[in-house]
Swiss-Prot record:
CDD domains: Ribosomal_L18_L5e. The keyword Cell inner membrane does not apply. This is Large ribosomal subunit protein uL18c. Binds 5S rRNA, forms part of the central protuberance of the 50S subunit. The lineage of its organism: Eukaryota, Rhodophyta, Bangiophyceae, Bangiales, Bangiaceae. GO terms for biological process: translation. InterPro entries: Ribosomal_uL18_bac-type, Ribosomal_uL18_bac/euk. It comes from the Eukaryota. GO terms for cellular component: chloroplast; ribonucleoprotein complex; ribosome. The keyword Chloroplast applies. It holds the Pfam family Ribosomal_L18p. Part of the 50S ribosomal subunit; contacts the 5S rRNA.
């Protein structure tokens, strides 16, 4: 049976998740990139709860971006997520790229979060 690209991404993500785990002191920043939008959330894996989330679907962000699927949208999502997490007292995180390459929209989100004050 031939493995398609979605199954390959899921396999990569599982392999990374074996090594990356978020805690209360250093939660996991998880990024999911679809064809239309980008989603990011800060997760405490021990409790199994999402602490902070942001996405390009958010109505406040949609007014400032033209497309939800470009690097500009990813930068605004990263900046928004960092502002929300710092407001909650979360600065140090572990970055989980979700099986995607650290390139393009994923990289833009990560760099914007770093510039806004997050450490990973």
């Amino acid at each position: 049976m031939k493995i398609n690209s979605k199954q390959t991404r899921i396999h990569k993500h599982r392999r990374v998740r074996k090594k990356v785990q978020g805690t209360a002191s250093r939660p996991r920043l998880c990024v999911f990139r679809s064809n239309k939008h980008i989603y990011a959330q800060v997760i405490d894996d021990i409790k199994g709860i999402t602490l902070v989330a942001a996405s390009s679907i958010n109505l406040k962000l949609q007014s400032s971006i033209t497309l939800g699927s470009n690097c500009e949208a990813s930068r605004s999502v990263g900046k928004t997520l960092a502002e929300r997490s710092i407001k909650e007292g979360i600065e140090n995180v572990v970055f989980d790229r979700g099986g995607k390459l650290y390139h393009g929209r994923v990289e833009a989100l990560a760099e914007a979060a770093k510039e806004a004050g997050m450490v990973f």
